[in-house]
């Protein structure tokens, strides 16, 4: 049986997710109520039976470190592990200078473990994937590198590495974040083939390429710009079509679902994808669960049913986590993390509320993301007057209001 190792790159700063990333790395941002973004890649690896994982961290990693240590305890008796790898300056007094450099500075891990194949996956995407099917493709093609790819609308091409392939799936072109007209999928001028940032290497090839790249002073030391863009011209680089990946328990509608949640708008929409009656991505797949830390909180509680004065505790088309209390208020099309309290006569609509938030009586909240440890005073209105909101909060061009972690909001704002 082949020896496998997963290197999970979780050191991303996530500037486009500011202010959600002011105090945490992007993979540590909460998602779907009770998860962190990093849980999706780790769950995919665990469900695929790849049980040796190194999580490479750097930027504001305390929250991420704490989460991984609490949630991801595999059994050492079977040599299974999820281990954190902080920046250690092993090759000199410098931090990681790119995703490829993060691997170079930790090559000792790979050479010590001696895997036959090494997965190098990002930690900031939402999806389900059986990574062993990618391995089967890699072996079948006798590839040295396999890149997972997904079709995207052509107008989004400037945000991704865009790939061109031949009829056998071999990479024949690659441009990182093209600023001019990108290559489209043959027969489909509306879509491009984008790299998912997930790579599978034959380990010998990985070590050779990483060492070669480290010795190039002109390199950006980035997997897309530097490794893939160079390697496909010289070696056997193939592209795995993620749309072919079949996950147990997944509906046909969910197949191929993958979201880069690197911007506020993309993050918000991916969360909203979860609350539909028939969602395009369901958290309720027992055959391929998303694992996370288990809280010792009581069940969610809904209280008051006074229809005559509109004091009814209810939630519709929403995800409400453990420890929440919906007290005579209405939550609609929203996601609540643990220990959120929504008090009487308040309404929360199309919003994402992080842990330990209190929403006062008669508040009206719409299209907002509220970070942890925020107390919203009674009668506060958010999301209904963007000009007023911009004086106090961050508001995106699409009208999403973000309230940073621990922000103090004055009564009567």
Swiss-Prot record:
Record InterPro entries: ADP-Glc_PPase (IPR011831), ADP_Glu_pyroP_CS (IPR005836), GlgC_bac (IPR023049), GlmU/GlgC-like_hexapep (IPR056818), NTP_transferase_dom (IPR005835), Nucleotide-diphossugar_trans (IPR029044), Trimer_LpxA-like_sf (IPR011004)
Functional pathway: Glycan biosynthesis; glycogen biosynthesis
Gene3D superfamilies: Hexapeptide repeat proteins (2.160.10.10), Spore Coat Polysaccharide Biosynthesis Protein SpsA, Chain A (3.90.550.10)
One example of a Gene Ontology biological process annotation: glycogen biosynthetic process
Enzyme Commission number(s): 2.7.7.27
Reaction(s) catalysed by this chain's protein: alpha-D-glucose 1-phosphate + ATP + H(+) = ADP-alpha-D-glucose + diphosphate
Nucleotidyltransferase is among the record's keywords: yes
Amino acids binding alpha-D-glucose 1-phosphate: 161, 176-177, 195
Function: Involved in the biosynthesis of ADP-glucose, a building block required for the elongation reactions to produce glycogen. Catalyzes the reaction between ATP and alpha-D-glucose 1-phosphate (G1P) to produce pyrophosphate and ADP-Glc.
Enzyme class per UniProt: transferase
UniProt family annotation: Belongs to the bacterial/plant glucose-1-phosphate adenylyltransferase family.
PROSITE patterns: ADP_GLC_PYROPHOSPH_2
Keywords recorded for this protein, A-Z: ATP-binding, Carbohydrate metabolism, Glycogen biosynthesis, Glycogen metabolism, Nucleotide-binding, Nucleotidyltransferase, Transferase
MF GO annotations: ATP binding; glucose-1-phosphate adenylyltransferase activity
Name of the protein this chain belongs to: Glucose-1-phosphate adenylyltransferase
Quaternary assembly: Homotetramer.
